[in-house]
């Protein structure tokens, strides 16, 4: 995959070249999307809109730390949707990991989560965030036990995963409504890189075959159900709904 690669570390140790080789990234000087290695982390930037800033994965500080400490935890909609209750903490495959937010919420609540991400740039960002998270004195221990990354396309990988999870979680990128100047800056940068998941409808069936208990699909509240398969079961919030489908028992 082509992207502009920028090293701002000043280290001159070739770390960015190693990273590019690992994720199959090719430097393209003219690409509007840039993957930047800073002294602190790896981040994604939209070069023609510098005011949007850089996107990076941070499980240790910032919004994620706040959500871990002060968020709803087990009471969060995603936790309710996957079925966390009492001692029941399902094993989850997050088949559209993105920046890992929902996966992290579930891991924080006690679930073991395997994240699948097919885009190599996003996978590199996730891997960078995980490495810093694993090294953190406060959360590193449980994060290593509960949150893992698999770089693969869910369309093919869902049939190969073992052991089977109790829950498969899907949050496909859905095109935002027009005139959404207020779409978060981060989402604008992210969508510029990955675009909508036009093949997302193909995920529902393999997800249902893989999950032993349920499949949870996060949708904007204005979006039709995935693959146009309606379900009466959903956890609904102000802006989203978490549609719930039966899996395939062992």
UniProtKB/Swiss-Prot annotation:
Task: Identify the enzyme class.
Answer: transferase
The GO cellular component terms are: cytoplasm
Q: Where in the cell is it found?
A: Cytoplasm
Q: Which organism is it from?
A: Escherichia coli O127:H6 (strain E2348/69 / EPEC)
The record describes the protein's role as:
Specifically methylates the guanosine in position 1516 of 16S rRNA.
EC number, UniProt record:
2.1.1.242
Any single GO molecular-function term of the entry would be: rRNA (guanine-N2-)-methyltransferase activity
Family, similarity comment: Belongs to the methyltransferase superfamily. RsmJ family.
User: Which reaction does this chain catalyze?
Assistant: guanosine(1516) in 16S rRNA + S-adenosyl-L-methionine = N(2)-methylguanosine(1516) in 16S rRNA + S-adenosyl-L-homocysteine + H(+)
Q: What is this protein called?
A: Ribosomal RNA small subunit methyltransferase J
Q: What domain of life is recorded for the organism? A: Bacteria
Q: Which residues form a coiled coil?
A: none
Q: Which PANTHER family match?
A: RIBOSOMAL RNA SMALL SUBUNIT METHYLTRANSFERASE J
Keywords attached to this Swiss-Prot or TrEMBL record, sorted alphabetically, are: Cytoplasm, Methyltransferase, rRNA processing, S-adenosyl-L-methionine, Transferase
Binding-site residues, S-adenosyl-L-methionine = 101-102, 117-118, 153-154, 171
| Principal subcellular localisation of the protein | cytoplasm
């Amino acid at each position: 995959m082509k992207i502009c690669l920028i090293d701002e570390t000043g280290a001159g140790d070739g770390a960015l070249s190693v990273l590019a080789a690992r994720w199959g990234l090719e430097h393209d000087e003219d690409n509007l999307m840039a993957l930047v290695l800073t002294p602190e982390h790896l981040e994604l930037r939209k070069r023609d809109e510098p005011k949007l800033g850089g996107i990076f994965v941070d499980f240790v500080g910032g919004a994620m730390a706040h959500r871990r400490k002060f968020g709803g935890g087990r009471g969060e909609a995603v936790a309710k949707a996957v079925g966390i209750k009492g001692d029941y903490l399902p094993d989850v495959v997050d088949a559209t990991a993105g920046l890992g937010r929902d996966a992290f919420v579930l891991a924080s609540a006690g679930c073991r989560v395997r994240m699948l991400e097919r885009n190599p740039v996003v996978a590199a960002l996730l891997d960078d965030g995980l490495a810093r998270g694993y090294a953190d004195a406060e959360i590193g221990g449980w994060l290593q036990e509960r949150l893992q990354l698999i770089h693969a396309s869910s369309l093919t990988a869902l049939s190969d995963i073992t052991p089977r999870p109790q829950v498969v979680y899907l949050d496909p990128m859905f095109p935002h409504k027009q005139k959404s100047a207020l779409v978060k800056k981060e989402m604008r940068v992210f969508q510029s890189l990955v675009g909508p998941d036009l093949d997302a409808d193909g995920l529902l069936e393999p997800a249902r075959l893989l999950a032993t208990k349920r499949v949870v699909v996060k949708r904007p509240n204005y979006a039709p159900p995935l693959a146009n398969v309606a379900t009466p079961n959903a956890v609904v919030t102000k802006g989203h709904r978490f549609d719930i489908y039966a899996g395939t028992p062992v």
